[in-house]
């Protein structure tokens, strides 16, 4: 798997199928998006995950940065699932101020050669989070790609989300968390010499 991190200056030569998101926990909802882009490999598209580093919530001080999975764990999961390219786009106040239309035109269409986007129904991107799946659907025909919006997944009548899974983990409700993750939950413990 190719990893592009720490730079906004990149170009993907191969046509791509892209999933955009934070992918914290790589839970069942995320996997649904990933299944869509992986399914496009049979049409010659490279499966590409686009994520922000740090997340917008961390950049703007709305989150403490606690995540279900570390960067290294996410990378291993993506590689195991068959993702071809992972882009960890550097999010700064400047890049976060990119208008959504410019993001779609310059980054998705030109830099990434996007031909297909799997978008969660709660996708937001660009300045003030103003970009969404609906905007991508409107712009897609003019930019040479198509968009499939994926509905939220529920487990036992509850919407799967990283926020809810973090709550389950904090409460020690591991079986429920693992059901939404679709895999066992692991945590890394670091020790220091005493």
Indicate where each model-derived feature is located.
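N-terminal catalytic cores of NTP/NDP-binding nucleotidyl/phosphoryl-transfer enzymes
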Residues: 7-71
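Conserved acidic residues
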Residues: 15, 84, 115
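Short glycine/serine/threonine/alanine-rich loop segments
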Residues: 43-45, 83, 145, 183
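Classical nucleotidyltransferase
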Residues: 97-189
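Conserved small/polar residues in nucleotide/adenosyl-binding loops
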Residues: 190-194
């Amino acid at each position: 798997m190719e990893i592009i991190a720490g730079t906004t200056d990149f170009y993907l030569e191969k046509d791509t199928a892209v999933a955009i998101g934070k992918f914290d926990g790589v839970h069942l909802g995320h996997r649904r998006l990933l299944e869509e882009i992986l399914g496009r490999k049979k049409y010659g598209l490279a499966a590409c995950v686009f994520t922000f580093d740090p997340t917008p919530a961390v950049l703007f001080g709305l989150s403490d940065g606690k995540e279900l999975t570390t960067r290294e764990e996410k990378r291993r999961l993506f590689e195991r699932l068959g993702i071809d390219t992972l882009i960890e786009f550097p999010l700064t106040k400047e890049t976060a101020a990119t208008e959504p239309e410019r993001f779609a035109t310059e980054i998705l269409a030109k830099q990434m050669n996007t031909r297909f986007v799997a978008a969660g129904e709660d996708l937001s991107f660009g300045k003030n989070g103003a970009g969404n799946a609906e905007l991508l659907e409107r712009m897609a025909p003019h930019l040479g790609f198509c968009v499939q919006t994926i509905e939220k997944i529920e487990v036992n009548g509850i919407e799967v989300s990283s926020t809810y899974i973090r709550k389950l983990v904090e409460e020690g409700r591991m079986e429920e968390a693992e059901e939404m993750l679709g895999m066992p939950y692991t945590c890394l413990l670091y020790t220091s010499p005493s």
